[in-house]
């Protein structure tokens, strides 16, 4: 029942992304907000109505990029907050909206765009090493050679040292 529309545009480079939506079983559940996403506090990632539910990744309503880089930063926030909740404490970690998108501008050079809520730049590296606003060969090498083993051998096994969450700063 989806309306199909054909759009023709001329371009030099195009990046096409399918619409990002939560699955039907989430959209129709009491967990969802009016737009169909799991309705969480965007800092703690705790559900706004069901305090025993936490959410991360592509199904929750934080206005960030739905990327693996975002989920990588969200997972430790949820983990620390669930442990605090089990101990009867308030949430101790917060998510800053981090997302990352390596933008290929030519073979051998990318812009390693890293950003948080409101488009705030959140670089992982000093600007003199990798400037996230400019294409570089070093960023390409990072994406090509270093990030795959970090992803497969560390991140997916819960041993990724660069994903430490921020502490809650206040309400």
Residue ranges and their predicted role:
Residues 1-8:
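Conserved beta-strand-loop-beta-strand element in the redox core of flavoprotein oxidoreductases
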Residues 9-74, 80, 84:
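FAD-site-proximal beta/loop scaffold in flavoenzymes
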Residues 13-21, 99, 105-109:
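Glycine-rich beta-alpha junction loops
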Residues 36-54, 105-126:
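FAD-binding beta-loop-beta segment adjacent to the flavin cofactor pocket
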Residues 43, 90, 97, 126-129:
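Mature, folded catalytic cores of secreted/periplasmic enzymes
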Residues 70-79, 108-116:
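Short, electropositive alpha-helical surface patch
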Residues 71-97, 102-103, 151:
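Internal hydrophobic alpha-helix adjacent to the cofactor/substrate pocket in enzyme cavities
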Residues 112-171:
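C-terminal auxiliary extensions adjacent to catalytic cores
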């Amino acid at each position: 029942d989806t309306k199909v529309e054909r759009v023709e545009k001329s371009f030099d480079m195009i990046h096409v992304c399918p619409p990002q939506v939560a699955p039907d079983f989430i959209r129709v559940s009491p967990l969802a907000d009016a737009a169909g996403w799991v309705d969480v506090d965007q800092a703690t990632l705790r559900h706004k109505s069901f305090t025993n539910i936490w959410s991360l990744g592509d199904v929750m309503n934080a206005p960030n990029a739905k990327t693996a880089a975002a989920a990588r930063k969200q997972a430790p926030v949820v983990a620390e907050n669930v442990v605090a909740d089990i101990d009867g404490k308030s949430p101790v970690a917060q998510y800053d909206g981090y997302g990352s998108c390596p933008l290929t501008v030519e073979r051998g050079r990318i812009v390693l765009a890293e950003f948080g809520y409101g488009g705030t730049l959140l670089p992982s590296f000093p600007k003199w090493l990798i400037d996230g606003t400019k294409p570089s060969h070093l960023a390409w090498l990072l994406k090509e050679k270093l990030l795959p083993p970090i992803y497969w051998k560390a991140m997916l096994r819960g041993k990724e040292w660069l994903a430490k969450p921020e502490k809650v700063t206040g309400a």
